[in-house]
Amino acid sequence: MENKLSFEEAISQLEHLVSKLEQGDVPLEEAISYFKEGMELSKLCDEKLKDVQEQMAVILGEDGQLEPFTALGDEA
């Protein structure tokens, strides 16, 4: 699975695959292929969400409050 997909692109592709599978008229081998691709897309989305959670933890700090921002040279 190409990791260069954005979260939104991966979700869109995943929704498309789920829609195809929900129709129920997909041959078994094709359904298995869709399922595998869907699992890869799901993993990619999970990784991207974890990255964002880590970034938010840094921004919010340990106590869940926004950390004060000091621009370079503003340290008084």
Curated annotation (Swiss-Prot):
It is found in: Cytoplasm. GO terms for cellular component: cytosol; exodeoxyribonuclease VII complex. One of its GO terms (biological process) is DNA catabolic process. Pfam families: Exonuc_VII_S (PF02609). It comes from the Bacteria. SUPFAM superfamilies: XseB-like. Signal peptide: none annotated. The keyword Cytoplasm applies. Heterooligomer composed of large and small subunits. This is Exodeoxyribonuclease 7 small subunit. The lineage of its organism: Bacteria, Bacillati, Bacillota, Bacilli, Bacillales.
